[in-house]
């Protein structure tokens, strides 16, 4: 009996030591996969923004007290007359895991809305998108199949019924960073331009008592019309719903309405007969350009995003050269102080509730990693050593007669 107990103790002790070593070095890394029950909500603080009021523009009614300005009287009111300088805007994003999801991949669906706080639903809605991306649960990177979609079509209207957005291959991160993230650059997907660009590590800090990494990215002015048209046309011709999406991204008005002087006109619309030009000047076509500076903070062990800020600016320009000129710091400051081309300027920052909620999710993941990677191996190792000692002691101790 003594020999049997000794043998069992040695075998169990050795097994526990192997388990204690294997758990943090092999089992835990293999177990770092995204969960299948992802649910997260984030919203930004209500913030003073600039906004071109499309309804006021269509009706020809200047916003606020701008109706008293000279350029806002008569038939050819300038675009600046319809831009709010101090409207309050907020954003919300809701992310959930959807099918198809299995042991190797998880599909995330993100719904994002941008809305005014001075109006009630549904009149407050400025934009709404539904984004779907399938991630490799082990690497947290998008799969290489063309299964991502981005629905840019407004949810209202008959053209939206039954609409299916084009599928494409996504290459960058967006809702989740890799578990065990490093202090380096990562490819990041921008949902406005549908492009992937590096987002760079810039700082290490602390939030909620945990270490965080902060990454930053700035995108130069990019034509949203060209970027979104390229995506929407990728599966063939444009539908009526998709043409509606593009309508607001390219506008044509007489030069006077844009506030242009003769020497500022770069591309008068082709086919314009100077003899038939009105006092407002030739028609000038402009596209909406987009630039953004974003900062994202993550808990590096879990890859969970715990804070975010995006300074978004959309404005109209005649071409890329003019867009870059407008975006220069001195011109940018002048434009935002007295907007004439701005479609939207939104310095969005996550609110405290969102930051706290995401940090709770990160801490839950950290707790699991710590338990499996530290606590359990220590207990298993100590118990294994104890059993080995007992087994060897029983073997070496002489049996009494």
Which residues make up each language-model segment?
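Membrane-proximal extracellular "stem/stalk" segments
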Residues: 260, 266-271, 277-374, 384
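Short N-terminal edge-element motif at the start of the domain
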Residues: 161-193
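Juxtamembrane interface at the cytosolic side of transmembrane helices
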Residues: 2-11, 365-401
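Solvent-exposed N-terminal domain segments of exported/luminal and surface proteins
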Residues: 2-157
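Membrane-proximal low-complexity regions enriched in glycine and acidic/polar residues
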Residues: 184-315
């Amino acid at each position: 009996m003594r020999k049997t107990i000794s043998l069992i103790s040695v075998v169990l002790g050795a097994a526990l030591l192997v388990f204690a070593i294997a758990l943090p070095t092999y089992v835990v890394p293999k177990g770092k996969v995204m969960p299948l029950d992802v649910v997260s909500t984030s919203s930004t603080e209500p913030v003073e923004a600039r906004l071109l009021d499309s309804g006021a523009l269509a009706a020809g009614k200047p916003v606020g007290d701008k109706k008293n300005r000279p350029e806002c009287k008569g038939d050819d009111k300038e675009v600046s007359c319809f831009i709010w300088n101090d409207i309050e805007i907020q954003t919300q994003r809701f992310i959930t895991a959807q099918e198809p999801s299995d042991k190797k991949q998880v599909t995330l669906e993100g719904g994002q809305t941008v809305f005014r706080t001075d109006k009630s639903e549904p009149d407050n809605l400025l934009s709404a998108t539904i984004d779907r991306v399938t991630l490799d649960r082990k690497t947290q990177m998008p799969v290489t199949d063309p299964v991502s979609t981005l629905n840019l079509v407004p949810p209202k209207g008959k053209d939206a019924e039954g609409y299916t957005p084009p599928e494409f291959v996504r290459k960058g991160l967006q809702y989740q960073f890799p578990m065990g993230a490093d202090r380096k650059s990562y490819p990041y997907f921008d949902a406005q331009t549908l492009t992937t660009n590096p987002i760079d590590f810039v700082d290490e800090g602390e939030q909620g008592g945990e270490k965080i990494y902060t990454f930053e990215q700035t995108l130069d002015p990019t034509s949203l019309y060209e970027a979104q048209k390229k995506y929407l046309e990728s599966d063939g011709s444009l539908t009526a719903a998709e043409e509606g999406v593009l309508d607001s991204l390219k506008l044509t008005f007489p030069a006077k309405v844009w506030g242009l002087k003769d020497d500022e006109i770069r591309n008068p619309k082709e086919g314009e007969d100077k003899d038939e030009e009105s006092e407002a000047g030739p028609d000038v076509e402009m596209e909406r350009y987009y630039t953004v500076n974003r900062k994202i903070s993550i808990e590096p062990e879990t890859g969970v995003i715990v804070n975010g800020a995006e300074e978004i600016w959309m404005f109209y320009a005649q071409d890329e050269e003019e867009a870059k000129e407008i975006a220069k710091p001195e011109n940018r400051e002048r434009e935002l102080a007295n907007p004439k081309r701005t479609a939207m300027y939104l310095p969005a920052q996550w609110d405290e509730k969102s930051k706290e909620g995401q940090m709770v999710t990160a801490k839950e993941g950290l707790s699991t990693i710590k338990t499996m990677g530290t606590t359990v191996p220590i207990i298993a190792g100590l118990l294994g050593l104890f059993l080995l000692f007992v087994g060897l002691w029983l073997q070496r101790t002489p049996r009494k007669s």
